[in-house]
């Protein structure tokens, strides 16, 4: 089977191409990582204070509850998954420690950090640890209290008729905590999520400042090193797992680890394939979708497709060049004020035109894209926002992150899967990841249902591209 993944890059600041280059314009790995050992794990306290003040100002009133994450057990209580802090908590407090919760009073202007100090038993196993008060000062917060006082603070506010603003929970323990604090059944929490808070957090987090841009560029530099390692290791006889292990190690060596589970597969027609047991074969293609997080948890995300034996066949090159042309065109279109859904459609049109030249599609390609026929080959959207999450703020909801009152989600195949459709603005960071996939099960389904009949040449598709 032939499978081509996305040629993916990032759009930063004024929606321009992300550059990670040394002074002479060439990548120099020794220089790129020279200062990595001196990096902090937080911005200065005033950064977080400024963000919280802006959140309060825009929201106007009420109590804003921002719970951090807790440790999550893997297979028994004492053996936990690597800790990952909630990204919104990180944005407003910067503290990458489990068991904290932040409260912002939008009326009084007061910030509070709730948590527990470490016990002597903790210190025996973990060594000396900073106090809750010391941690709070790093975030510009002076008032701290134990978690038992959080419940009392929330109860007092509710009794006074004040609104408690909170975001949609995505972890079970956070759902249960919010349920207990607010007196709302877990299955009913979604009805009480603060839409004003969701929209305000998105509006703040989606516009990256210079500090954040630098962190994302650093994440992209780590991601570059990961993908260069793939290119060095990719050859017949290598097991996918060897490459996956090597690049995951690079992500951890220079940052906080991978930004999502690495996809390293010569069966690239499966979009999110986390099986790494195949032996690479000459004539096949290796798809790698992988990225890294910095120590501050800012993310990168790149996809590349590599011929296992170092040389594309004519068929493979034809498809690859179509994807590359779509990628290049979307970079040209990216600018403040541009609609991201129009960039998606432009990429879709280039893919459709290219496939028509190969005989895989026929007829009027404008009409073909309008009905979503190219989604047989690119069943996903063009890309997504990126920042403290690789799919930035996806937990808050795509209807707030990718769409707004001006831009509503389409039901057309392909466009319906687009995570982001709204206008671009300076400071947004976007991925651009067009791709062509040959997915046998999807081809079977569409052909059986009579979809795109007269537009897609199913006979040619099966005879030359599903081998």
How does the language model describe each region?
Residues 33-467:
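Active-site neighborhoods and metal-handling regions in enzymes and metal-associated proteins
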Residues 11, 27, 34-36:
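Short hydrophobic targeting helices and cationic amphipathic motifs
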Residues 2, 23-32:
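Positively charged N-terminal leader segments that act as targeting/secretion signals
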Residues 8, 22:
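Cationic, low-complexity basic patches in intrinsically disordered or flexible, solvent-exposed regions
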Residues 18-21, 35:
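Periodic, rod-like helical contexts
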